[in-house]
Amino acid sequence: MTTPVCISQAFMDSFHAHHAQLLGKRVWLACSGGRDSLGLALLCRTLFDQGRLPFLPQLIHVNHGMQAANDEWAQQVAQWAQQHDMACQIIGLNLTHKSEQAARDGRYQAMMQLMNQDDVLILGHHQDDQVETLLMRLFNGAGVTGLGAMREWTSKQAHTAQSPPDVNKPRQRIFLWRPWLEISRDQITEYAQRHNLKYIDDPTNVAQSPSKLALQTLNDRAWLRSVLLPHITERYPQASEAMARTAQLMQQASDSIDEQVTQDLAQVALAATEQQSVIALDKLAGLSAPRQAALIHHWLAPYPNQLPPSKRLVDEVLALSFRQDSNHQTCLYFDAGSEQYQVRRYQNKLYRLQHAYAQWLQMMPHQIHLPLAHNAEELSLNLADTDVLSLKQSGLEFDWQLTGVRGLMAHLARLLNSADAKVTPCQLIFEPLPRTIKLALAGRSGRKSGKKLLQALDQPSFMRGSVVLCRLDMMGSDGILQDSSTAVPLFIICIDRIWVLQSQFTALINQLLATEVLSTQILEC
């Protein structure tokens, strides 16, 4: 079998493997003008002309402005695309003085701004790139997932630059497709030479004198390619194939671990939203130490493309989870790249909170007065058009909403009206939970206030600034509030639930909650 057939067969095998995922999607090809990406573009053109490939990808070239020749390269790619009747988009950037990783991230972000949701980007990464990626991650102490290196098909999400993000628009996601991961650089070189492909050689990708270490003049990947790997393959000729096979085995092992973690997480998770996730420590303790570590590793950075936590952070979280003293005030901070998080413990629960959300929790709710005026002949409600009440000031990153306010007030007004035709005017008041008022939770004995009440509400210390009391206050005929003895506490609103208080309206509030007429939620603005 000749080299060109190997290359085209590898591409078609990958195409058939991901045919269902490609259906209905627009396909792009990242083309630097180098041997790998230009060879891939030529192959796509050939397969399309032969009727074997049902689409012709659109080329994207990023002119990153880091070298004097970049403008010339962009022009060369555009001319090649025109000659081969392939659409091509040139993106201009200035990534001068950026690190290797920052420049790579910048190129991806620029391409994603051009692409639509769920578009596919073909990349020319090959077996030698896979080996370099594996070695770089190995030298940085990566675990099983990291040593899986690059996957043939994976998703990538954009880091949103909008603050606050638009919750009505999902964070952009594209798919990366690498059909040549089993093809070597030498095979691609031979293919390019067979077709007289005039590709670009980036001088920063190789050493001028590979016999020297060139530590100062080469980036990490180029140093591995030009200096270290030639010595390895001289001693072990099959090293590249063996290391690429190791990456595949690591991917399989990582998938197996992920399946186990998913099952374990379903057992230990108490609640999970984008803002916070809670796990039960007694159930976590029932897992073996390796499964505990794997679960925490996944739990700390649960979304695609987030930076994986270090082993040190995982160990610190496990130490916090199982410490025996009563001091649970420790807060661990970490940056997952796309999000910053806090990890806190309260009693036998472990919380992962978005850092911005944790700060928002400390902002006090504002006081709200809703008059409820009625008489025996006519019922009138002073309500806004909306049925939703925001419990904290607007303009913040999150909106804490109480839904069903109109229904609540209508039911209260009818009960009061039917009980006494001459009942005095009333109003609903929502306010931060006073620490001095003793309240009785429905279905429980005794009255509590302050810290004991908050403990009964199962509220962690870091959430106690976001607790609201709803009470019904009676007003005199002159419209002035009477003394506090005429107030009827109805319920307490916490971040995650509503607690009903003992009153003559307990049955009504319970019914509204059971039918989900009355509910609370937090939205990201």
UniProtKB/Swiss-Prot annotation:
Keywords for the protein's UniProt record, in alphabetical order: ATP-binding, Cytoplasm, Ligase, Nucleotide-binding, tRNA processing
* Membrane-spanning residues: none
- Gene3D superfamilies (alphabetical): 1.20.59.20, HUPs
Q: What is its main location?
A: cytoplasm
Q: What's one GO MF term for it?
A: tRNA(Ile)-lysidine synthase activity
In which residues is ATP bound? Answer: 32-37
Give any Pfam family that matches.
Answer: TilS
Is the Transmembrane keyword given for this protein? no
Domain of life of the source: Bacteria
The EC number(s) given in the record are: 6.3.4.19
Enzymatic reactions: cytidine(34) in tRNA(Ile2) + L-lysine + ATP = lysidine(34) in tRNA(Ile2) + AMP + diphosphate + H(+)
Q: Identify one Gene Ontology CC term for this UniProt entry.
A: cytoplasm
Cell compartments where the protein resides: Cytoplasm
Q: Which GO terms describe its biological process?
A: tRNA modification
* NCBIfam families, A to Z: lysidine_TilS_N
Q: What does this protein do?
A: Ligates lysine onto the cytidine present at position 34 of the AUA codon-specific tRNA(Ile) that contains the anticodon CAU, in an ATP-dependent manner. Cytidine is converted to lysidine, thus changing the amino acid specificity of the tRNA from methionine to isoleucine.
Q: What is known of its domains?
A: The N-terminal region contains the highly conserved SGGXDS motif, predicted to be a P-loop motif involved in ATP binding.
Could you say which protein family the record assigns here?
Belongs to the tRNA(Ile)-lysidine synthase family.
Q: What is this protein called?
A: tRNA(Ile)-lysidine synthase
Organism the protein comes from: Psychrobacter sp. (strain PRwf-1)
- Gene of origin? tilS
